[in-house]
Amino acid sequence: MGKEMSRRSFLKAGTAAAIGLSMTPGSMFAGVDAKKKKKGVKDGKLKILGVGIGGRGAAVLRGLETEDIIGLCDVDWKYAAPIFERYPNAKKYNDYKVMFAELLDQCDAVVCATADHTHAIICAEAIAAGKHVYCEKPLTHSVYESRLLTKLAAKHKVATQMGNQGASAEGVRQTCNWIWNGEIGEITKVEAFTDRPIWPQGLERPAEEPAVPSTLNWDAFIGPAPMRPYNPIYTPWNFRGWWDFGTGALGDMACHILHPVFKALKLTYPTKIQGSSTLLLSESCPNAQVVKFTFPARDNMPKLAMPEVDVYWYDGGLKPERPAGLPAGVDLNVQGGGVIFYGTKDILVCGCYGAKPYLLSGRKPEVPNLCREVTLSHQQDWVRACKEDPEVRVPSASDFSEAGPFNEMVVMGVVAVRLQGLNQELHWDGEKMEFTNIPADATIRSVIKDGFSIKDGHPTFNKTYTDPVNARQFAAELIKHNYREGWELPAMP
């Protein structure tokens, strides 16, 4: 593999840091020299910059009001107006590049909660400058971007956190502890779902081209994506449903719902993946989709073997079959989704964020705690990590050493859906970030417009397709985007 550190290596390092330092339930910093730990903590408040503050960013910032928020940026000043008013001492911007040019060297940390497609370029610049980073989920828009942020964070030894707040909650810890203690036995199948999307998907590109509002910096919103005319269907909020800007229900919610799966089963790269959906359009994510990930066997734990496992994802109203023994009337949807772990001894069910886990047998076993207990909020756990010396830092609950590889898995599902027209199971080489079984001459196309109509009781099917493109090249662009001119990521460490 050469000089590059593998995803498996990063994951093992992250797991060791997050679990191995805190095996004693009563001590957050077990195994760390107390005097050295105290010396490493910085006094005073963090100076924080916020990018993307009108939506999820507002909630994140409210959890950071113990610190000094010195600069705020949002491309939409109408949407962000209440947040600007809440922090009157922070300088205001509508272009993060301008804010970074003026304030990046003065800050300690950056919060990023912009549209998905700009997460990587904002976070990468901040990390390369040695700044701590909190980034909303999904961490990035592509596999390559996730790998880059993982390696940059390790290189620059900054504290990081992805905004999947369930990672700091009790449900994920309980799920991991039960599974790691062997309570449900070996797991070879997991099914998960969300009730999303709750934003528009399955849309064609709008024909209307209204004027850009004076309060919106459209060029900054587009960022590294290809330029297109403004339409209010894209932003705010609705970016999630458009391929150029978002990752659909899978990207938006799997970072919450699949996190206990990734963590408890110590997943690494999938080796095989396939996706299907309702009508697949070239511009917008489908209304409903199913993805199957296959992961190879992992190293066994003392009380648990880790065989090959299939993980299934459903969204858009689709759900897995109810497990045998689940009482009638019990809703698997808890806080927006659910997960079913099928073990050889029992079945474990939990909700979105890992919430309210239970065993189908009704047992409530008392087991050793092998996870660090997070007594702070998700944001404040990151603040704690920011203020610790890198040599003794206990990683936050969703540090990029774990969140980066995890997000690769999530956006791999998005790629599989977009490649479903190949009509094959896709084989994945995680180290190289490439598919190994797409034929060299394979082509792929997608629907631009669905011209279905009914006249006098007779249906007409008249779809307009994109021109066929080489499937390998198309897949490569989904894995590593070609940014538009003027936008560039740092080199991969």
Give the ranges of each region predicted by the language model.
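N-terminal secretory signal peptides and thylakoid transit peptides that target proteins
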Residues: 1-18
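Short amphipathic alpha-helix with an adjacent loop that forms part of the alpha/beta core around
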Residues: 99-105
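Short acidic-hydrophobic, aromatic-tinged amphipathic segments that line or gate anion-handling sites
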Residues: 91-95
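N-terminal Rossmann-like NAD(P) cofactor-binding module of classical short-chain dehydrogenase/reductase
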Residues: 110-111
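Predominantly a Rossmann-like dinucleotide-binding segment in NAD(P)-dependent oxidoreductases
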Residues: 52, 60, 156-162, 166-275, ...
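Glycine-enriched catalytic-core subsegment of oxygenase/oxidase enzymes
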Residues: 38-39, 65-66, 70-73, 79-80, ...
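N-terminal Rossmann-like dinucleotide-binding module
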Residues: 17-87, 166-169, 261
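Beta-strand-loop-alpha-helix segment that lines the small-molecule cofactor/substrate pocket
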Residues: 115-116, 120-168, 182
